[in-house]
Design a protein with these regions (language model features):
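Terminal amphipathic alpha-helical/low-complexity segments used for targeting or macromolecular assembly
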Residues: 1-66
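Solvent-exposed, flexible loop/coil residues
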Residues: 22-24, 79, 99, 126
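Glycine-rich hexapeptide-repeat left-handed beta-helix
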Residues: 2-3, 7-20, 111-112, 116-138, ...
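Left-handed beta-helix
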Residues: 70-71, 76-79, 84-85, 89-91, ...
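Alpha-helix N-cap and coil->helix boundary residues
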Residues: 47-51, 102, 153
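Generic structural signal for beta-strand residues in well-ordered domains
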Residues: 60-62, 108, 127
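Short gly/ser/thr-rich secondary-structure transition/capping motifs
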Residues: 48-50, 68-72, 90-94, 122-125
């Protein structure tokens, strides 16, 4: 069966499930590798080298003039993250973003945040996944080492 481009991301946006054995999942694997490479490049630069932002802009597909993210930073699906104006994410953030993450205006995040938007299917836990979006509301301040893990069906 042939699947349209972006099909796997539609499934993720709708909560899944997705199946890693299906051909459509290759697009997700490609995005994960793209994101890992861009994060690794950004994280390899010295903290006082402002050019690390170029990799993060490519990761998220937008200019980050109004957003500040400190490295080290890890995100597996840059195409599933949106950030409004004035967002600040301190170092050591890990975003497992396949289900989607939205940072509304003015969100401030302390070091060490962890956000998970994916879960394993309870019956086929090695091959199928379900998803749920996380939205951090306008002007929220998130403390150090906070974990967000969606409770998924």
């Amino acid at each position: 069966m042939e699947y349209p481009k972006g099909y796997v991301f539609e499934l993720m946006a709708n909560g899944g499930p997705t199946d890693v054995r299906e051909p459509y999942f290759m697009e997700a694997i490609d995005e994960m590798m793209r994101a890992r490479v861009l994060c690794a490049k950004a994280n390899a630069k010295m903290p006082d080298d402002p050019s690390y932002v170029e990799e993060l802009e490519e990761l998220f597909g937008r200019k980050l003039d109004d957003v500040r993210i400190l490295t080290p930073f890890i995100c597996d699906f840059g195409n599933r993250v949106t950030m409004d104006k004035g967002v600040f994410i301190n170092h050591s953030a890990i975003l497992s973003a396949s289900g989607g993450i939205e940072f509304e205006d003015g969100v401030q995040v302390a070091p060490g945040i962890r956000i998970a938007t994916i879960n394993h299917d309870f019956n086929e836990r090695h091959t199928k996944y379900t998803y749920r979006k996380v939205t951090i509301k306008k002007n929220a301040w998130i403390g150090m080492n906070v974990r967000f893990a969606q409770v998924l069906p």
